[in-house]
Every structure is written in C-alpha cells, then in structure tokens.
UniProtKB/Swiss-Prot annotation:
Gene name of the record: NS1
Family named by the database record: Belongs to the parvoviruses initiator protein NS1 family.
Record keywords: ATP-binding, Covalent protein-DNA linkage, DNA replication, DNA-binding, Endonuclease, Helicase, Host nucleus, Hydrolase, Magnesium, Metal-binding, Nuclease, Nucleotide-binding, Transcription, Transcription regulation, Viral DNA replication, Viral genome packaging, Viral release from host cell
Record note on domains: In the N-terminus, the endonuclease region is involved in binding to the origin of replication. In the middle, there are the ATPase and helicase activities. The C-terminus probably contains a transactivation domain.
GO CC annotation, single: host cell nucleus
SUPFAM superfamilies in alphabetical order: P-loop containing nucleoside triphosphate hydrolases
PROSITE patterns the UniProt entry points to: PV_NS1_NUC, SF3_HELICASE_1
Gene source species: Junonia coenia densovirus (isolate pBRJ/1990)
Bound cofactor: record note: The endonuclease active site can probably bind other divalent cations.
UniProt-recorded Gene Ontology molecular function terms: ATP binding; ATP hydrolysis activity; DNA binding; endonuclease activity; helicase activity; metal ion binding
Protein name: Initiator protein NS1
Reaction catalysed by this enzyme: ATP + H2O = ADP + phosphate + H(+)
Transmembrane stretches, start-end: none
Length: 545
C-alpha cells in the first residue's frame, strides 16, 4: 500500500516499499448526503506532512494508513482510478474554485447547470460539493496561457460569483497519492450537501451516508483524522473567503462572509421585477420585454452589466410557462380580466407584439370561418381537429407529440398557429437539419412548443426526430455552449411539401396529420387574430382544456 508516493516518479522524497491501491466496484447514489462527518471546527492549517493529512498518518502508522486508504478507494473507485491512472495528463492543472451564491434560492438551478456540464464534459475530471450558500468545484484543466476557460464559469454567473481559493495552481505531475486522498476526504467525505463526480462525462461513485457514518465512527473516535479541513495545498475555502463559524441569529447557517454575498440582493430584485413585467406585458418572444417602455425606464434593468441577470430571469419565466397546461395559462391571463365580457374584448395592454391584433370578436369570427372552410363546414371535423390539437399541446397522449398540416401556400397555416404561438410565448423554431447546419435544433431546449416550418432533414437524423415526435428526451447541439437536454416539447409542423416522416410507418403513432386547401379569402384580412381567441374557440366547441 502506497503511503504517499507520487503515481509518477517526480519527487525525490518519495517513500519506498508501499503497495498499490486496490480498486473497488459498487455504486451508491451521488445524491446521498453525509449526515455525520468529522468535526468541522476550523483550525490552523498544517504544513505539508503535518497533522491532519494522509501523509502524516502514513508516518505515524502504516497499518492505519493502509486501512484508511482502502476505505477511501472503496468510496471513490472512479475518482482514484482516474487520478492515479495513465489517462490523466501530467501537464494539466488541478483547479479548485468556489461559487458564492447570490441567493440561497438559486442553489438548485446552479447545481443543475453543474450536473449538465459534468455529463457533457467528455474528458477529464469534474466534481462539486455544495455547502448551503456556496459550492466547491474541482477539475483538471489544460490551463492554456495560465488561465482556465471552461464554459461552466460563464454559465453560473447569473447565480453567483466564482472565486479562487487563493492557493497557487498546482499541476498534476506534482501530486502524490496522499494529496489525492486529502482532496477526496475534504470535498466528498466531509461535505454535507449535494456532491457529484464526473469522469469523462460519466457519473462516478461518491460516499454514501452509511460510509460517511462508518468513516466518522472508525477514525474520528481514534483521532486518526484531524478536525482540520485543510492541507498544505487545499486550504479550506471557507478560510479563504473569510467564513466565520460564529453563530448569527440573522443567518440561517451561522456563517458570516467578510465580503457579504447577495442575499435577496440585486439578482433577486431583477428577477422579481422582470417576471412581474412579463406577467403584465405578455410579449413574444419573452426577451422582447426589453423593448417595453416601463422596462426601459428602469435604470437597473437597462444597465448592460445586468444583461445576464435579465436573460436568467427570462429563462426562469419561460420554465414557469413550460410546465403549465393550457388551463393554467388561461388562469394566468384571466386573473385581472374577463375575456368573455364585451367591454374587455380588446385588452391590448397585455399582449405586446410586432404585429397588430384584431379584437377578440372579429378574431373569433375569422378563425371559425377558416376552420369551417378547411373542414368542409363539418362541425364534427372541427371538434376532432381542436381536440387533437389540445391533446398534443397538453401532452395528454403518450408517444403522440407532433401535429402536422400540409397544404398549398396561402392556406392560413401560419395565420392560425401564430395565434397559438403568441399565446404560449415560449416557442422555438427548428431549422433545416443537414450537414451544413449542425445546430438545426438548438432552439428546442426550454420551450413550451416548437415550430418546424417547411421541414427538411437527412436520414441520419431520423432516430432523433422519432424521439422528438414521440416525446422522448433527447440531446441537441447548441452553438458556443454545451449540448442541451430537451424534455417532451410539442412540435407543430407546417409544410407545403411531403416529407418522409409523413408516410413512414415508424412515425404513424407519433404525428396527427391534416391536409388544408388554399384560402384566398384571407388576403382581405390585414390584422392577425388575437391570441386569446384560441381559448374562446375551445369554449365555443366545448373542448376541455
């Protein structure tokens, strides 16, 4: 068993005659938390090889060291398999950062971003451990030009500030095995919050609650492990950021930062104000809220430095909408208005758009005229059409996630569906999926509905489109960002031409198809139907939503 030698012969002070660490399989959930850990009182950090490090334990007792090393290997087999293996680059740097959250309520969103990044990182090590109002992040990095350019740093900016630990960057070739033990103990054994390790994008094993309890019982009682959270190279981030353990009645976790992080501060205000305006002015797309005069009159909202906060608030509002059914959206829009009252037939103040809407009465009349024309004046066909549309939009039927209309030009397809897109707001448009467009589906993530106008795709994407039309989760490439996960999102397809998925058997249960005819009478209408017309239409034909 190795008592502190480097995994590469780079240090002249290595100690001989030690065994190779054994590997262990077995997995536990990364979400399990360590409820009992070593005493977390902050003490003065010790010099290298001093008290509280695995190197010091190796000096004191080889038997104790071997036992502890074996236990650590069992608790983090993937972690140690990578850092002591041949695939890790000696020239890479070990980076340790701390995310100071601006608001504790942003913690889960920030953790989701870190998990998604960890899954998408196809090389190297990435891990994090959460401690309430801050999150520790570690990873190996090429450290080009002596700087880390990993994209997760910019992705977490809306949630807090990324701070360095204050220690000089250390390269992989400088690490001894005992150093890696100390890293694992500090970040993944002693931490109480959410923890995760990713090796080449695959989730690695972390200590379970039982393992942490056993570690505490076996080693804390014997005082084999110091209560210090720090070693020479991994100084406690809490000390670096001046966290005090003094009890504070005004702090939920009893910690005080010398440089106070925002608590319901600027970002919380911006998010609250932006979402309030988005409820007052129903704009499409959501980001168009920046053009509303009331938004532009607010100096804080208009500050270019707060652009990321505004985008994060808009994304958050979009997620609220994405989880809503048609009925919930209707309730949201009718809290302050009675849209069936003749005096409220034209509530323009709610809907802000680049196009001008007709009033609800005229809008309803023209939409009914269009549907009667396309359904041969058959009310049963109109009811069937609207019922199928609601089933797709509300994701009611498993594997049925696409609604298609094929017609000649000027049939009223966009005229009808612009009303729905204006209502749902959070919609994305799919592009032409060919070898020249690698990001055709980049607008698919975090949307309430998707529009695919005049679809065209290569056969290699057939399986992805099957998942899309069947409501299965899938991943898409996004320009200048990591790959994004897409949950079930309804797809509206409008086309003038026949495309392969319209007649392939594999898609028959995934798509509802209708054929429309050219509607020349629509050229006499200059205004678009008001979005709220859709709800009046459903009520007229007794469609449940």
């Amino acid at each position: 068993m190795n008592n502190g030698d480097t995994n590469r012969e780079t240090d002249s002070t290595t100690r001989p005659n030690q065994d190779i660490i054994r590997e262990s399989s077995g997995r536990t959930s990364p979400s399990e938390q360590c409820s009992m850990v070593a005493n977390t009182s902050r003490k003065r950090e010790w010099s290298h090889g001093g008290r509280g490090t695995m190197a010091s334990i190796a000096k004191e007792s080889q038997e104790n060291f071997q036992y502890m090393a074996e236990e650590l290997e069992k608790m983090g087999s993937e972690f140690f398999g990578y850092v002591t293996g041949q695939s890790i680059k000696p020239s890479s740097a070990y980076i340790s950062d701390v995310i100071i959250l601006r608001d504790i309520q942003l913690r889960d969103q920030c953790l989701d971003v870190l998990r998604e990044y960890g899954r998408s990182r196809r090389n190297g090590l990435f891990g994090f451990s959460e401690e309430g109002d801050h999150i520790h992040v570690i990873h190996d990095c090429s450290y080009t030009n002596r700087s880390c350019r990993d994209i997760w740093i910019s992705q977490v900016k809306p949630f807090g500030s990324v701070q360095k630990t204050g220690k000089p960057v250390k390269f992989i070739w400088e690490f001894k095995r005992t150093d890696w033990y100390d890293v694992f103990i500090y970040f993944f054994v002693r931490k109480r919050g959410e923890r995760a390790i990713y090796v080449r994008g695959e989730s690695g094993k972390i200590p379970s609650n039982d393992e942490c309890v056993r570690w505490t019982r076996e080693f804390k009682e014997r005082e084999m492990v110091s209560s210090s959270d720090c070693t020479d190279y991994y100084e406690c981030e809490q000390q670096e950021h001046k966290i005090s353990r003094r009890s504070d009645a005004g702090s939920s976790n009893g910690r005080l930062y010398e440089k106070k992080a925002y608590s319901a501060g600027k970002f919380a205000y911006i998010r609250k104000k932006t979402k309030a305006l988005l409820r007052k002015y129903y704009v499409s797309p959501v980001s168009a809220i920046c053009d509303v005069p009331e938004f532009r009159d607010d100096d804080l909202l208009c500050d270019p430095k707060n652009r990321d906060y505004i985008q994060a608030a808009c994304d958050d509002f979009g997620k609220d909408l994405n989880a809503m059914s048609l009925r919930e959206i209707y309730n949201l829009l009718t809290e302050d208005y009675n849209f069936t009252d003749e005096q409220e037939l034209n509530p323009y103040a709610l809907f802000i758009s680049s196009m001008k809407y007709d009033n609800l009465e005229n809008s309803l009349n023209i939409i009914i005229e269009l549907l009667k024309f396309q359904c041969n004046d058959d009310e049963d066909l109109i009811v069937e059409f609207l019922t199928n549309l609601v089933n797709v939009l509300d994701r009611r039927i498993p594997k049925l996630n696409a609604f298609l209309i094929i017609s000649p030009p000027s049939a009223g397809k966009n005229f009808f569906f612009d009303m729905i897109f204006g209502l749902l707001l959070s919609y994305g448009q799919l592009g032409q999926a060919n070898r020249h467009n690698l990001f055709a589906f980049q607008e698919a993530p975090n949307k309430r509905v998707l529009l695919w106008n005049e679809p065209n795709y290569e056969s290699s994407l057939t399986d992805t489109i099957k998942m899309m039309f069947g409501g299965d989760p899938y991943t898409v490439r996004v320009k200048n960002r990591m790959d994004a996960h897409v949950k079930r999102t309804p797809v509206i397809i409008l086309t003038n031409n026949t495309v392969p998925f319209m007649y392939e058997t594999a898609f028959s249960d995934r798509i509802i198809q209708y054929k429309w005819n050219a509607a020349p009478f629509l050229k006499d209408y200059e205004l678009k139907p008001h979005p709220m017309t859709f709800f009046l239409l459903l009520s007229k034909y007794n469609i449940t939503f």
